[in-house]
Structures are given as C-alpha cells and as structure tokens.
C-alpha cells in the first residue's frame, strides 16, 4: 500500500511539473509595476512576453489580459478585457513588444491591445497563457469569455503573470 501511494504521489508531482508553463516579461516582473510605456499614458503598446515549458500535445497557445479591479459603478462585472490573442503557434517562445497573432475585441470594442488606464487607484492586470490541445485557426471570438468557453476542457497547462499599474503615480518612470 505504501509503495502504491508513493508511486501515485510521484506521478502526480511529475505530471504537475511537466505541465507548468513559464510566462514572463522583460518589461516587468510578476506582481510589479507595468512601465508607463505600455499604458494609455505612454505608447499604449503591448509588452514583450516570453513563454517556456510548453507541454507536449499543445496545438496552440492562447493569451488573455484583463483588469478585475474596475469599479462596479463603471462596469458592473468589474472586469475589463485589455487584450486576448489566439492562434499563437505551439512552438512560439513569446510575443514581441507590440506583437500578437489573432486578436479579439478589447473592452473598448476595438481589436488589439489597450494598455492599463485605471480611473481611480492601482489595478492588477492578469496576463494568462493557456496551452490548448485544439486548433483555433479560422475562428473568431467576440470577447474573452467566448474564447475561454471555446478552450474549456482543452487546456493542457496555464500560467499567469500579474502586472500592477496606478495611473496617478505614473508607474515605471
């Protein structure tokens, strides 16, 4: 029994380690300030992102960025979609600054990236990278929720990078 339990624990930890994706940015570290350059006060261009440890069997990568700290008086859901990208090749090592693949409509109703621009205080910006086992070529998604619904049950691994931004303090200057 002890041997069986030991084997099961080893398999569990080996599987978890194999499915861990690294998502980083040369522009900022996890839970640190996003530089002004990438905001509405700067060039409003997307930061470079790096990917590592993509699991075997991945058909495509999907990336989302959203702000869950929007005052509910401005947006009842409290979430604002800043960027979502799909059709990223499985062998990709990242997205260059200002780059992307197929990009959906951000919270302003326009396709592409829109940088941090909080109306009140410091907000958190969640970048999420998903490795999926289905191709998404030729598909269009009206919003982040539709994309996330399409990949449910097909996520092999995921990672998260959180950036912070406070417009009033001019982060990253």
Model-predicted segments: where are they?
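N-terminus-centered regions that define maturation/targeting leaders and the start
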Residues: 18-173
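Sec-dependent N-terminal signal peptides
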Residues: 3-15
């Amino acid at each position: 029994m002890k041997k069986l339990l030991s084997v099961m624990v080893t398999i569990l930890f080996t599987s978890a380690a194999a499915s861990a994706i690294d998502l980083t940015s040369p522009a900022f570290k996890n839970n640190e300030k996003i530089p002004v350059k990438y905001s509405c006060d700067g060039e409003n261009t997307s930061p470079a992102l790096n990917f590592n440890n993509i699991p075997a069997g991945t058909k495509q990568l999907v990336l989302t960025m959203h702000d869950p700290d929007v005052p509910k008086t401005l947006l009842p859901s409290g979430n604002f979609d800043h960027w979502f990208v799909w059709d990223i090749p499985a062998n990709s090592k990242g997205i260059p600054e200002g780059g992307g693949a197929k990009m959906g409509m951000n919270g302003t109703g326009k396709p592409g990236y829109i940088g941090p621009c909080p109306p009140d205080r410091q907000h958190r910006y969640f970048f999420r990278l998903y490795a999926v086992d289905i191709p998404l070529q030729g598909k269009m998604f009206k919003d982040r929720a539709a994309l996330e619904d399409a990949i449910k049950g097909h996520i092999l691994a995921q990672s998260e990078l959180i950036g912070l931004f406070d417009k009033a303090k001019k982060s990253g200057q």
